[in-house]
Amino acid sequence: MKNLLGCSVKDLEKIALNYGQAAFRGRQIYNWLYNYKNRSKSIDEINVLPLKFRDQLKNEAFLFGELTLKEKYLATDGTLKLLLNTRDNESVECVGIPTEKRLTACLSSQVGCPMDCKFCATGKEGLKRSLKVSEILDQILFIENQMNQKVSNIVFMGMGEPLLNIDELLLSIRSINEDFAISQRKITVSTVAIPKMISKLSELSFQVLGKCQFTLAISLHASNQKIREAIIPSAKNYHIKNIIDDCREYVRETGRRVSFEYLMLHGVNDKLEHADELSNLIKGFQCHVNLIQYNHIEEVEFKQTPIKNAQLFQTRLSNSGINVSFRKSRGSDRNAACGQLRQNDKIK
């Protein structure tokens, strides 16, 4: 089966020409595929195409999408989690997060995750496989269709480690930027940090995208190596100081600041001495710390840092000259928040 989702306008023009059609037929497919207001769900719906051409595309197994909707969960704050099934009977989750002026799509890059971070539900079932470009992009279509709103922002913070699927990730970003008309500056890629991959991300971004303007978010979650190894098993292979050094180089190469994600775990990493340690670790280059509230999962007994303690931690960082904010949790009552995505209700 050949998926049209992810094809550029030139790709679609070439397909049209290969079937004896004029190039503008490819542009018509492109418009019906990516234009939010005119989007169709199947080849049959593109009634501006000749019937013969539509039949040819269907007979050659051309598709508009890869996924099917299994379940949807609406949180009290309007956050929508979708459980989607792949063609090989795996399951993946994505989340639509609405605010007054925008709709953020939280996308998955893999089915499951190999990193096994102790505070995250996704890694509890391990990695099944990486997602294809069409499967990543199809999540956007489902969110827009279910929420009747165009996606304005993208965060690769769903299931999986994006840098372990870097080729499909960058092709997806290119399509999101060029075909879905979402600026790179409205895209965030979150990674637990893989050895040598931060520099590779910078290098390949310039090769594939021509520029590197999306936000890189490092799931740091600790102020020292000992704590990080205790909650992130893969940290044993990549020392925290080496991560920061690679981030400094990334900023020099791209001109883009790095965001450090810091999940606050009560009694683990939330003391003021940890704030001081963190500020000393990351000071002196263009970065931002995003403090995150812990969202409960069944398998572990971590506790949320009390709000008062979190505010003191934030103030301590700010007083040290660190750019810092506190991310409000969304969708936790339907297990749609950070760290709660998994392969729920998988079809057997």
Curated annotation (Swiss-Prot):
Disulfide bonds join C106-C338. It is found in: Cytoplasm. S-adenosyl-L-methionine binds at G160, E161, S190, S219, L220, H221, N295. It catalyses: adenosine(2503) in 23S rRNA + 2 reduced [2Fe-2S]-[ferredoxin] + 2 S-adenosyl-L-methionine = 2-methyladenosine(2503) in 23S rRNA + 5'-deoxyadenosine + L-methionine + 2 oxidized [2Fe-2S]-[ferredoxin] + S-adenosyl-L-homocysteine; adenosine(37) in tRNA + 2 reduced [2Fe-2S]-[ferredoxin] + 2 S-adenosyl-L-methionine = 2-methyladenosine(37) in tRNA + 5'-deoxyadenosine + L-methionine + 2 oxidized [2Fe-2S]-[ferredoxin] + S-adenosyl-L-homocysteine. The keyword Disulfide bond applies. This is Probable dual-specificity RNA methyltransferase RlmN. Its EC number is 2.1.1.192. SUPFAM superfamilies: Radical SAM enzymes. InterPro entries: Aldolase_TIM (IPR013785), Elp3/MiaA/NifB-like_rSAM (IPR006638), Methyltransferase_A (IPR040072), RlmN_N (IPR048641), RNA_MTrfase_RlmN (IPR027492), rRNA_lsu_MTrfase_RlmN/Cfr (IPR004383), rSAM (IPR007197).
